[in-house]
Amino acid sequence: MKKLMTLAFMAIALTANAQEKTTIEVPQWVKNIKFSGYGMLQYQGQDPEGNATNSFNLRLARFILDGKIGDFDWRAQIQGTNVKGPGEPTVQLVDLYAEWRKYPEFKVRAGQFKRAFTYENPTHPITQGWRAYADVINNLSGFGDRTGEKSSGGRDIGVQIFGDLFPNANGRRLFHYQVGVYNGEGVHQKEKDNRKDIIGGIWVMPIKGLRIGAFGWTGSRGDMTMKDADGNNVTGSVSKNRYAFSAEYSQDEYMFRAEYLHSQGFGSGKAGNNTVDYSLGDLADGWYAFGIVPVIKGKLHAKARYQCYRAQKEWGTSKSSYEAGLNYFFTKNLEMHLEYARINDRKLEKSDYNLVDLEMDFRF
């Protein structure tokens, strides 16, 4: 009898313990956290006269945490790349922001994130489809910006409001707006001249997959070394006044995009440099257009791109390229990109040269 009572008490204790364990719940915000990322491996060769190169390259790696807390989404994204050059890797936090998304008509984002300028800038490198962003995007959207801002991946620190308006009978919204206020100095940089950058954009979406828009940007970059009226070096700010016109169609694996960008304002012309180079002038512009179409849906895409960047808004300073290639998808998480470019750089004595790029990209 005593043994039976002991066994009974043990059974009750085990049952109670099991019930206690089942009542422990993980908070919903923890359940909502998602980890993802991707890597891009690259081989690139080019043959400009006197400066031919070919090299394997770790283009970049991204590690992404996304989460949701009530009506707020948040993201933290770390990037590793050899942006400084072979043997000089850079690992940094590129995105850290929270976003209030209760209403589709009005959303708010705050932190460090992509500037609200152009269609291409916010695109992930792995989904952008090319060996690099267009030259005009790199120079006028805060990558290796012509002002001298260090490479910031098109990002800045600030606050942005945005939303989609005017739903049609099918619920598809026809108009998008976005306006942001930023420090204007790039990633991990505090304000240097107490003058904020204001960037805005609007676009219409008349049919599914099509959007046509325009963007504007006014601001400054502080802590620049420049000349005063007497030729003495002084510290001050340079202006950034820019606009862009954009069009894109993306539907059923077909992607076509074209953008024109214009910039007014002096700069150093070199990323990470704070000395104004007046010989570069205060005007620059550029454009690109590309098409990516399915040859075998879900497996093989063909692509072509034309781009031009004029560092002084003159043809004598233009760099143009004509590009063609293929993107092959082994699975949805593994793809290979092949690209050939014929480049004309008028700043070189022998302006024409070739470039070949091969990439293996994966997602997780």
Which residues make up each language-model segment?
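Sec-dependent N-terminal signal peptides
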Residues: 6-8
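Outer-membrane beta-barrel pore domains
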Residues: 48-50, 97-101, 109-112, 121, ...
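Positively charged n-region of N-terminal signal peptides that target proteins for export
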Residues: 1-4
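Active-site-proximal beta-alpha loop/turn segments in soluble metabolic enzymes
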Residues: 180-189, 224-230
